[in-house]
Amino acid sequence: MESYLPIMNGMTTGIRQGRNVYEGYQRGWGLQFGGLREKVLADPLYREAFAVARDRTIMSEENRMNIYLLLRFYLDKIPFGHIIEYGSYRGGSAIFMAYVAQKLYPGMKVFALDSFEGMPQTDKNVDAHNAGDFGDADLEKLQARVDKLKLDNLVLVKGFFEDTNDDVMAQAGKISLAHIDCDIAPAVKYSYEGVLPYMVDGGYLVFDDATVSSCIGATEVVEDLLIRRDGLNSEQIWPHFVFRAFK
């Protein structure tokens, strides 16, 4: 399929201040104002992937579309790496990404990390969520769905990130897309710092909920670590934060 991304007339492409402004506008402006949403909705692969994942996902449509655009049009521009998701809940977004990746990138795996038993104890001075939130993941049914779809590129990893991340990285080696969707500050912090050394040059760091009203703790991690400490600039702020990991 030919690209249906918008052409940003008068803009030059390339990396500036750690981000590709042109590509950020293509996706963000394209989805919000440029008619790109309708083109994604008409894309057969997007429709197929959403159809097999829709009953297990709570991700917003715009966020899902942006993830799809990254997979469909941008990952092949950077070095090969696997996909990791921190915070998979019922597995819908992981299924969606794995379905698309299986069609487009032979050999690429999606590692989906979650306790699959709900949130741990939270600091109510920082995070709005409570211990046990998202406890209805039902890992057994999720695995059955993965098996039925023959998504042998999707690896479900049960446990807290600090207990599983090292083993996952030993298997994966390189990551091209990190989808960080774990809502609370300690988990977002661990995810970012745990994946950063393994990101390929130009890899994508996507924060699903750091702009969500119930996840100010996640926002603080982005502000404190990525922006203030590490000096990163976002390539997108809508529909979610997207940063690049350049070497």
Task: Report the location of each language-model feature.
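S-adenosylmethionine/decaboxylated-SAM
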Residues: 4, 8, 36-61, 72, ...
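General helical structural elements
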Residues: 20-23, 68, 94
